[in-house]
């Protein structure tokens, strides 16, 4: 099993290298998409995140958290799906992590030689956003690193979350980078090496790897350029620090603190040697400490399962929200 995890690590790590950051002059970009889709910024001051709101301002609340180096645009199809439902009003809160996809790094900036956390402070800020805006136990959906943030939010602020959906993420990525018995402490040297390599990699190497990685993360060719652009306009050191944090953080001991109904949807690892059965076993073992968790594999999809094709993902999302 752990051989499978170690092999999976190489596949997973290949999807995470990011392009060199490009300077931005505003709190976040993609404003042209906002104008087209009608969302507006939330009234919330933070140097870790900013939030876009779509849909019915009197509707039920759902928070969408994108993954590493991704923008809120990754959820546009999901937003369209939710807001088009007859008889169901949704107020959709999309998180944009500072330093990702054109947003200035601000509080997530990496200013020293040693990396500082990104995901954990973002989870705390989302909890503050929920509290200060009096959101009544919103549903939370997180993709990849966004799933990690969702787990942190639900475990560390259990009264804040009504239900949780994690998309293609396990609670301890570090298990994929070491032998049986790997712990957060024992994998720390590996995580530190990843930080150094990714934070200092030349732009050309990042661009080349990002292009190859997107081909494995998204099956639908027409959707790849958006993800590539998000990566290209992300702060390289923020992305590197966030990935290092994912490797070095073991959330398995915290899973029992989660009280919200939780579903984890995932796809088979993108390699013929990683069978659906091996993938299932990895997820079952990883989430064994979360009582009542529902695990669902989405077949014929890729890491960004909201794209490839989206109908299966929407079906699972609708089922989670209907419970």
Task: Please place each PLM-identified region on the residue numbering.
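Bacterial N-terminal signal peptides
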Residues: 6-15
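Active-site loop/oxyanion-hole signature of alpha/beta-hydrolase fold enzymes
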Residues: 38, 44-48, 91-141, 145
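Conserved HGGG/HGGXW glycine-rich cap/lid loop of the alpha/beta-hydrolase fold
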Residues: 54-106
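Conserved hydrolase catalytic core segment
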Residues: 136-178
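Flexible "cap/lid" loop of the alpha/beta hydrolase fold
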Residues: 164-200
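Conserved alpha/beta-hydrolase catalytic His-Asp/Glu region
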Residues: 175-182, 197-256
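Conserved loop-alpha-helix segment in the C-terminal half of the alpha/beta-hydrolase fold
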Residues: 261-301
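Catalytic histidine-centered segment of alpha/beta-hydrolase-like enzymes
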Residues: 301-310, 314
């Amino acid at each position: 099993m752990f051989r499978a995890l170690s092999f999976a690590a190489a596949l997973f790590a290949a999807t995470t290298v990011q392009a060199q950051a490009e300077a931005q002059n505003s709190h976040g970009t993609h404003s042209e998409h906002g104008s087209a889709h009608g969302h507006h910024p939330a009234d919330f001051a933070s140097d870790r995140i900013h939030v876009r709101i779509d849909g019915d301002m009197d509707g039920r609340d759902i928070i969408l958290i994108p993954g590493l180096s991704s923008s809120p645009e990754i959820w546009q199809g999901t937003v369209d799906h939710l807001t088009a439902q007859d008889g169901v009003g949704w107020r959709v809160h999309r998180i944009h992590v500072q330093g990702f996809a054109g947003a200035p790094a601000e509080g997530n900036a990496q200013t020293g030689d040693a990396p500082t956390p990104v995901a954990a402070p973002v989870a705390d800020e989302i909890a503050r956003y929920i509290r200060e805006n009096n959101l009544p136990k919103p549903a939370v959906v997180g993709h990849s690193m966004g799933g990690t943030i969702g787990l942190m939010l639900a475990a560390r602020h259990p009264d804040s979350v009504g239900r949780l959906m994690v998309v293609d993420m396990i609670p301890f990525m570090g298990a994929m980078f070491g032998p049986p018995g790997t712990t957060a402490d024992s994998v720390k040297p590996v995580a530190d090496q990843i930080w150094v390599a990714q934070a200092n990699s030349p732009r050309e190497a990042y661009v080349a790897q990002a292009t190859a990685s997107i081909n494995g993360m998204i099956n639908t060719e027409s959707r790849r350029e958006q993800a590539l652009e998000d990566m290209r306009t992300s702060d390289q050191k923020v992305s590197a620090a966030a990935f290092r944090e994912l490797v070095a953080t073991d959330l398995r001991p915290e899973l029992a603190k989660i009280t919200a109904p939780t579903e984890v949807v995932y796809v088979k690892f993108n390699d013929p040697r990683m069978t659906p059965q091996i993938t299932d076993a990895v997820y079952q073992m990883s989430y064994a400490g979360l009582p009542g968790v529902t695990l669902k594999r989405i077949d014929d999809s890729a890491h960004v399962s909201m794209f490839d094709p989206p109908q299966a993902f929407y079906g699972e999302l609708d089922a989670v929200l209907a419970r």
